[in-house]
Structures are given as C-alpha cells and as structure tokens.
Amino acid sequence: MRLPDIVGVELTGRAQPGITATDIVLTLTEFLRKEKVVGAYLEFYGEGASSLTLGDRATISNMAPEYGATAAMFSIDQQTIDYLRLTGREDEQIALVETYAKTAGLWSDSLKNAEYERVLRFDLSSVVRTLAGPSNPHRRLPVADLAERGISGVVENEPGRMPDGAVIIAAITSCTNTSNPRNVIAAGLLARNANRAGLTRKPWVKSSLAPGSKAVSLYLDEAGLTEDLEKLGFGVVAFACTTCNGMSGALDPKIQQEIIDRDLYATAVLSGNRNFDGRIHPYAKQAFLASPPLVVAYAIAGTIRFDIERDVLGQDASGRDIRLKDIWPSDEEIDAMVKSAVKPEQFRKVYAPMFGIQDQRRAAVSPLYDWRPMSTYIRRPPYWEGALAGERTLRGMLPLAVLGDNITTDHLSPSNAILMDSAAGEYLHKMGLPEEDFNSYATHRGDHLTAQRATFANPKLFNEMVKNADGTVQQGSLARVEPEGKVMRMWEAIETYMTRKQPLIIVAGADYGQGSSRDWAAKGVRLAGVEAIVAEGFERIHRTNLIGMGVLPLEFKPGVNRKTLGLDGTESYDVIGERKPRADLTLVIHRRDGQTVQVPVTCRLDTAEEVSIYEAGGVLQRFAQDFLEAESAAGADKKAG
C-alpha cells in the first residue's frame, strides 16, 4: 500500500458577512488546485476551521474530487457534537462519539500540536462572493470581476426574444450544497425578499430544486419558505441526481429552437460541483457554479451578462430600483431561521425508517438473471470475452486521440441527455426507441452497446489529431483514422479500429481524468481497444479505474510532453520494460518518416496490488481468478478429506 501525503491546511480568519460556504469552497478549490494536492489527505485546522459549522465543513470536504485530494478532514469538536444532535442522533450515540474522540486523541484539542511535512495557509477573510466557470470548478470568478473578465456586459432587453448569455437553466442542486442548511435557508430567504419586492423569474429560465435529502423539504416547510421558492420556479423536482449530472430534462421546444436559430450563447447556473463543457445540458454552451441564493438571483436576472452585484434586478411597487444587496439576507437572519426551522425530528422522520428491521421476503424467481437480448438498459456484459479476453501486447499501438490538459471524465464518457444525431441516439433509434425515451447516457450504463457509444462523444472535445484548414484544432467528437489520415466521427473510428483489432493508445496533457468517478470513462476506452494512456499527470480516481479495466497508465517525466516530442498522431507506439510499482518503462515512438524515439516514462501502477490487478486484465478478471482458485482449493481439500 502506498501511503498518501498528509497535508495540513491552516484556515485563518473568519468569513466576511454575506459569504456562503459555496464561496469559500470555490475559492479553496482554485487555491488547492494551484497547490497540487492530487492524491493527498488534507487535514484542515486553525481558528478559521473552528469557526465553520459542520455543514460548511462538509461542503468543503465534499468538493475534494474537484481539487484533487483523496480526503479532506476536520477534527471532531463541539461543532461536530452539535451537528449530531441537530440531525437527530440518540444521546447515547452522541456521548459515545465524544468520549471515544477524546480518549483516542481525535478531539480537536488533542491535535493542536500536530506537525505536518507540508502546510498550506488560507485566510477565510479573503473570500469574496464568487462564481466558478466557465468549464472548470477551479476556475474561480469573483462576481466583482464579471465585467473585467468579459462575462457581464450590455444586457439585451428586446421584447419577445432571449438575450445573448441567457440563463436557460438555474438549479439549486447537488448533495454538496443542498445538504448544508445555511445554504438552502439563505436561498429561501432571498426568494422571500425577492417576492416581496415584486421580482420574478425570467420566462426562459428552467429552474428547479433537487435537494440531497428529504429533510431539506421538511425544514423549508417549517421555515415557511417552500412557497416562496416555488413562486420563483424552484419547486422540488426530485431527491436525486438531476441537473448536476446532465439530467435537467428537455427545454421548452420554442426556447430550444430559438437557441438553435439564433446560435445564442446560452448558459446554466447551478449550485453543483462540476461545470465541465457539455455536462449540464447540450444547449447550455457553458455553465457556472454558484451558491444557492446566487442561483435564485440569476434566475431573476435571466442572463450571465448581468452584473449581479451592481445591475438593477427590477423595481418594487414604488418604483425603487432593487439590486442584489437589497434582497440578500443577513447572516443573523439566516442563522436565526436555521435555529428555529431545522429540527432533529425532521432527520429522524426521514432516516429512521431506513434502519428499521424490514421483513418483506419475496419468492426467489431464478438463481441467475434472465438476460433480455433487446434491452438497452441492462445487457450481458462483455468483460470476459472479445477484445478484453485477448492479450494486451503494448506493441504497434496507434493513437485514438491526442489531447490537451484538464481532460475530464465528461469528455471521456458524458452522462447527459442523448441526442438523435449522436452515435448512441442513432443506435437507440434503430432499436425502436422514440427520441423522447432516449433518456441519458448515465441511465444506459448497464448496456455496453449504448454506453460504449458515449466514448469521447462530448461535442466540446478537442482532439489535436483533427485540425481545420488554418491549423487550429477542430472541436467535436472526432478522430483521424491512421494510416489513411481520414477524419470521421469518433464512434466510427472506434468501430474501424475494432474491426481491424488494432491496439490503441491515448496521449494527453496534465490532470487527465478530472471530474466524476465515472466507470465508463475507463470501460469505454478499454472496449475500444485502448491498451495504454500516456499523460503528464492523472487524477487519482480515474487512474485507479483505468487499472481496474486493464489499461496501463504511463506518465511523462517532468519537462517532457506531447508538444516537446512533436507528436501529431501519425506515430505508432510500443511500451517495453518490466511493469513494477512506479518503475521506469520505455515508450518507443515510431514516426512515419522511419525515425524511432525512446522516451522514459513512469509506470503509474503505484502498488504491488495494482500491478497484480493490471496483469490479471482488470479487477473483474482478478476477481474471477481468485474465485476459481478458491473453488479449486476447496475441491482439493474435500477430495483429500
């Protein structure tokens, strides 16, 4: 087992009035990305950490994948105990937690003198109201800088037409933000103030509230804020993954057609964790992350071109101009409402039944699943047959794609709505499904014939092998098949290579595999025939998933990359050397002109266990081997006895 780096993050100061946990975590995400904490365990401490509620701490911890850390932890203190009591835990359990933490040295007072090899410092008082975007959660965008960054500008107000920069989706969503009572209550109070001032949501904005817990609805009802949110269009649509994961549903057809006809720059604003290009909605060209109350404000503004701090949201009954500061609730108002409306019995009502003894026995239908050959949702998987059953030679590999930095799992295998003109859409249409039943890529992950067609299906992809006449990289789900040099849609290229049984490789830049821990981001490339990926760096979760599918992750040495090597996709590749944890291997590049270049790379199988899984062909193959060996040993013992 490779021990992770333990990094101390000292939080100093206190957040300024009006600053939400979302503002803090988006600012921290930018800071920690720059500090390169990928794969590290972070321990937050200091006076700033002590001042944060447990809900605020959880918001910070839940964004760990966005800043690349494996874990983000706060020590146990009185805030922890108060939260356990607030959320309905039994007194005996609360007492046990406190006693155990103090006895085991896990209470915050016991950890004040902890020493770390690496310490980062962050001042909470430096945080300002902020968005993140477009394209990345670590791309912080202070609202005071909207004009300077070229986001806000002249707002078009032509009757009957959407403005450029129209916010077509405004969603209070994600488990990270909606599980924080202060964030949700703040949104409700802002909605109440907006309604009292006579402000309304713009008609082209599709708004929604998708809490991470049913308890949210209970305390919004208790606070009397549900109706205020619903009046602005923020009614509860589900307690599940929705807009965050590209499942906001269809737009009004007239709005969708206007976006297409006028080629509008349409956007989404949501309180989610991720805003990668193409993730939120096919017709939202870009997405911005914001706190729940800011999401409500942007639904009223109706356009990202709006300077949310300075511009006028509307007028009240007396004709007075209303700006954000006029409807933003005070911290004291938020805290008072949380204290009066959020109650332990709400959490007990929601969660206690989950842990109750249920005796609902059902008759056994069949010892084995009855596979349906025409299903597009669940199909017998191919992981022990076909290409995955063959030997990986790591020889003569051709590049499927040459990619830049910050490639996300949404680029590798999007999860949003399936469109008719996509490879998956065409397949589902041939299977007899009407377009309204296509659903999303995520819902078809149990059918490999649909899901593998999502591989690199993101229309925002830039494959550096595919260029325009002027030499710029062409955007789209495209590939160039070698040796012909023919450009085609990515799925057709994959089919071509699969027919030829051609081993493939992917070449990429830094931070490859950011975002959701999406298994199909690894499954898709392996089923396509990809045997290795060489990049400047990998996100931890995706690297692990690649190994689990039998794909070899290789890392360029510092200072070496696709650009310094002049790679253009016409090359073929071999990998030679003994695969050991973090061993130096040799990437042999065969150029079209006959030249051969040998480049040292690091084998990113970081432990002996990862080597074992990779050599078995992946985690499923390893499981099958272990199972068969155990069965064989049990049979031998029985025979001997």
What label would you give each PLM region?
Residues 316-330, 542-613:
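Acidic, glycine-rich flexible loop/linker segments
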Residues 283-291, 295, 301-304, 308-406, ...:
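Extended hydrophobic packing segments that form well-structured cores
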Residues 6-8, 39-43, 70-73, 119-121, ...:
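Structural motif
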